[in-house]
Amino acid sequence: MNKLKKEANVFFKKNQTAASLDFKKTLPSIELFSATLNSEESQSLDQLFLSESQNYSDEEFYQEDILAVKLLTGQIKSIQKQHVLLLGEKIYNARKILSKDHFSSTTFSSWIELVFRTKSSAYNALAYYELFINLPNQTLQKEFQSIPYKSAYILAARKGDLKTKVDVIGKVCGMSNSSAIRVLDQFLPSSRNKDVRETIDKSDSEKNRQLSDFLIEILRIMCSGVSLSSYNENLLQQLFELFKQKS
């Protein structure tokens, strides 16, 4: 019986080791995700340490400590980004399985609700992973990884072709979160912003149609040979001056 237990233990340990190695093979290289702090993040840390500067006695050791903490901060960001990608990969694979014919169309969504505290976090990780794997090279993947989380999630989730998203990555790389989001809104506006813009465009179109009707009527009256009053001449003069200012 003891011999059987020993053999079972050896078997399980071997399989556990093999599974661990297989998992490590799927892990992206840590070098790929070594996050460099952007200027804003680095300045924030400098500002934090500035208040501590009066306490140091050795300038050289103090600077070494600051550099070490900055390095650790970058490594923490790398680990966080690895986590998001690994999470996104698992959700991506689960969706492939749950999209098969023998599952209903709502199974994947129900699975998300069952597994995750919020659906948005799952879909954000999925969108993040999908954009990452579709980027054509490691340079772009590194640039995408350097973008602040919120901006990266928004970029991944926004509707738009890959070329546009690649262009946006180049534009926002190194920017702060708020600056990056402003650029995103310009080149990849959200559906809500598009709807508002379309409503404004429709409103302008309707006003222009009405203005065309009024102007045509004014031209018709003036061509009829009517004698304009000084008041109407003044109104027309104001209209011409306003038009010159806008043109």
Curated annotation (Swiss-Prot):
Transmembrane segments: none
Keywords recorded for this protein, A-Z: Plasmid
Source superkingdom: Bacteria
Disulfide bonds: none
One Pfam assignment: UPF0137
Miscellaneous note of the record: pGP6-D is required for growth within mammalian cells.
Family statement drawn from the similarity comment of this UniProt entry: Belongs to the UPF0137 (pGP6-D) family.
Protein's recorded name: Virulence plasmid protein pGP6-D
Annotated organism of origin: Chlamydia trachomatis
